[in-house]
Amino acid sequence: MAAQASEKLQKLDLNGQSGDAEADAPAAGQTQAGEAEDDSDDDEVEDGNAAGEGAASGGGAKVQSSPPRVPLSTLFAGKEYPEGEIVEYQNENSYRTTNEEKRYLDRMKNDFLQEYRQAAEVHRQVRQYAQKTIKPGQTLTEIAEGIEESVRALTGHQGLEEGDNLKGGMGFPCGLSINHCAAHYTPNAGNKMVLQQGDVMKVDFGAHINGRIVDSAFTVAFDPVYDPLLAAVKDATNTGIREAGIDVRMSDIGAAIQEAMESYEVEINGTMYPVKCIRNLNGHNIDQHIIHGGKSVPIVKGGDQTKMEEGEVFAIETFGSTGKGYVREDMETSHYALIPDHSQVPLRLSSAKNLLNVINKNFGTLPFCRRYLDRLGQDKYLLGLNNLVSSGIVQDYPPLCDIKGSYTAQYEHTIVLRPNVKEVISRGDDY
């Protein structure tokens, strides 16, 4: 979920507190028995439903259903989840890989890592199904709700009982931002928007276990003309991941990302466009139950001398555009989040008081959208919600858009700066 780099980020000022898997743990993106794949969508769904029914009846399904509905606790009975991509530290930090003290500290964080790895495996399985099934002609509501239902099923938390969503489920709403819209768009109730053949759609969603949020995103485009745009952003994100590490300055990461991104260009309808970094969108660190932890990872060169630190978790995300490379708020807001340590403002509207109670009990500081309030049976809440926003208790996240007619793309991964290695926790075979 993108962090906006300008006055919006300063306005947020979000703050939060922020051994190894067994050698025979399965590789990232695979279940213990391996994923069953089939080129036939009909066969997949039929077999998948049978697998899901078997799991529900105690049959102990060992493959994921299609669509994904089998809880990971069924697939990984030993509760040891796949590691992400392990990257050894380089240069002055290379000693950390073999340092016994650092390895010991790393082993002490096994519960923390298992929660992150479980959330990451949920994300991998859900997104890999989504990548195979998202097609032109689908409504955005159908796509978003399908992804969200899968995440809830795999985490084992439907989020309909008070406090259940705080234990696991959606880390933030499924963003489906199309073409010039770069981030923070998800359909509200009644939205009839349909995905088109020529669209470029960013799919950005989070899965969490106990507030350990895995934030990862990819871009869907059906026309190969956009391939260079997607390649630029994927390269830039991987460059940011490569450069990130303990004691690395944010400014150095941003400079490397920009150099990678802006070495690409894309030809659309006979016109050549340079791929530009969207300079006011950033990556960010992640704290427990808080998606934007207060530190920003720029995607352009600049003067931020803040350093990454041991034990921190970061979402490394980059955005490329054929437009101005700058986004502004536009369109109807759908994303919201309770501001951590918000000021205690007396609320005069009973609807605002009641809604704040619902938010605290069901989402805490996790982002939510209007559809999630609808799902909980809330109605006529918009006046109260706007009052919470104007009172500085809830932050709104309007869609962020470049100029109309432009195309934007996004790729994102979550990394954990472990004491002895860097783990790209959300890495998969897909990206």
Curated annotation (Swiss-Prot):
Cofactor: Co(2+); Zn(2+); Mn(2+); Fe(2+)
EC number(s) from the headed UniProt entry: 3.4.11.18
Keyword Metal-binding tagged: yes
Binding site for substrate: 184, 292
GO cellular component: cytoplasm
Cofactor binding annotation: Binds 2 divalent metal cations per subunit. Has a high-affinity and a low affinity metal-binding site. The true nature of the physiological cofactor is under debate. The enzyme is active with cobalt, zinc, manganese or divalent iron ions. Most likely, methionine aminopeptidases function as mononuclear Fe(2+)-metalloproteases under physiological conditions, and the catalytically relevant metal-binding site has been assigned to the histidine-containing high-affinity site.
Cross-referenced InterPro entries: Creatinase/aminopeptidase-like, Met_Aminopeptidase_Type2, Pept_M24, Pept_M24_MAP, Pept_M24A_MAP2, Pept_M24A_MAP2_BS, WH-like_DNA-bd_sf, WH_DNA-bd_sf
GO terms classed as biological process: proteolysis
NCBIfam families assigned to the protein according to its UniProt record, in alphabetical order: met_pdase_II (TIGR00501)
Protein name in the entry: Methionine aminopeptidase 2-2
